[in-house]
A protein has these predicted regions:
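Iron-sulfur cluster-binding cysteine motifs and their immediate structural context
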Residues: 2-5, 9-12, 22-96, 294, ...
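Non-catalytic accessory regions outside enzyme or core folds
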Residues: 2, 9-12, 18, 22, ...
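Short loop/turn hinge sites at secondary-structure boundaries
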Residues: 15, 70, 184-185
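Iron-sulfur-associated redox domains of electron-transfer enzymes in respiratory
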Residues: 83-359
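Catalytic cores of large soluble enzymes that bind and process phosphate-bearing ligands
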Residues: 19, 70, 74, 112-117
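Alpha-helical architecture
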Residues: 19, 46, 195-196
């Protein structure tokens, strides 16, 4: 019988946690937290429950409420939802960039401020809400002043438009709001937008036969992956930016291009940092990820292979095609032929060179 202890041994202690938040959401006893959400922020001297995480810990922690370890009750939900365990279901990564039935160079026609890289994801979600194809979307919300990221549950088109422009350069446990969506708000047509590790966690949920995960897998309707080579620790990156006197509210755009992290400010200044020299700012869990595009998604979107202001859109199955086609037909997205797929393949192969997790 699996418990969080198996997850801790195989993932947390080995520093391969992706930080996706899946384990937090599916835990029925709310036993698992990331340090920012810990219900107790001090060491407990009255019992053995010291649940304050280490200062630089990137993995979740246990509040010692696990029903497997306390009462020998069958669970294992957290283990079965994790994309980094020994028993994870691995989508075939060898053929990059995965199954693609159609690819497009596209951009949103929505008149919305701050839209990033063509705004196609925002447009797909906005149309899906308008047509009642979804009743919720799990996305990232970014404070426009501090750039502090958080998981956000959008329940309307207006909510989605508020998140436009949020940068997924920061790691945030996006799936942590899945429990609220499914168990509290009883949503059952949910879209999930995230980096490949997040989408791979959803794939784990879809593949498991654990009854406790069943409500979550049934509620997810659409998976949209964003191209990602790696994400950065928010606190560490802010310190790095302060070294070059860049405040978070001055940042207009952050992107990775040609081996560099490029930061553009509202004042017209551009700073670039070599990715090879940014290792200490990258989440440790990112270093074992080999998926650049989110192969297990329905739709993958990024800005590689298209010019400024456009998105590269990879349609992976008929399900994703249905959502995208309706978005185009309804005038939310403009398509201008195919994207250049070679740069996507090149970066996918480069990321595949990383060493896989070994047990």
């Amino acid at each position: 019988m699996k418990s969080y202890l198996n997850l801790k041994e195989e993932v947390w202690d080995r520093e391969t946690c992706s930080g996706c938040g899946a384990c937090v959401s599916v835990c029925p006893t709310e036993n698992i937290y990331f340090k920012q959400q810990s219900p107790v922020q001090f060491d407990c001297d009255e019992c053995a429950c010291i649940i304050v995480p280490t200062e630089n810990g990137e993995s979740p922690i246990s509040a010692e409420f696990c029903k497997v370890t306390l009462y020998d009750v069958n669970c294992g939900a957290c283990y079965n939802a994790c994309p980094r365990t020994k028993e994870r279901h691995i989508f075939n990564l060898e053929k990059v960039p995965g199954r693609v039935i159609e690819n497009y160079k596209a951009k949103s026609t929505l008149e919305t401020k701050n839209i990033q890289s063509g705004g196609v994801v925002t447009a797909i979600l906005a149309n899906a809400f308008d047509e009642d194809l979804i009743d919720g979307a799990i996305v990232m919300m970014e404070d426009k002043w501090t750039m502090d990221p958080k998981s956000y549950l959008a329940t309307s088109k207006e909510d989605v438009l508020k998140t436009a422009g949020s940068r997924y350069n920061w790691n945030v446990p996006i799936l942590e709001v899945l429990k609220e969506a499914v168990m509290v708000k009883k949503l059952n047509k949910i879209a999930v937008v995230g980096t490949p590790c997040v989408i791979n966690a959803v794939y784990q949920m879809m593949a498991t036969n654990n009854d406790l995960v069943e409500p979550f897998k049934k509620a997810i309707r659409l998976k949209i992956s964003l191209f990602c080579f790696e994400t950065f620790d928010y606190d560490k990156m802010l310190k790095k930016l302060k070294e070059v006197e860049v405040n978070p509210w001055d940042i207009k755009k952050m992107e990775i291009d040609k081996g560099k992290l490029i930061v553009s400010t509202i004042h017209g200044n551009v700073f670039d940092f070599k990715i090879d020299e940014m290792d200490e700012y990258v989440r440790k869990g990112c270093k074992v990820c080999r998926d650049f595009t989110g192969i297990s998604s329905d739709i993958s979107v990024g800005n590689v292979g298209t010019p400024e202001g456009y998105s590269t859109v990879l349609i992976r199955n008929k399900w994703g095609k249905g959502f995208f086609d309706r978005t185009v037909i309804n005038g939310y997205v403009s398509v201008e032929g195919e994207a250049s797929i070679d740069p996507v393949i090149s970066l996918s192969k480069k990321k595949m060179e990383r060493k896989d997790i070994e047990f």
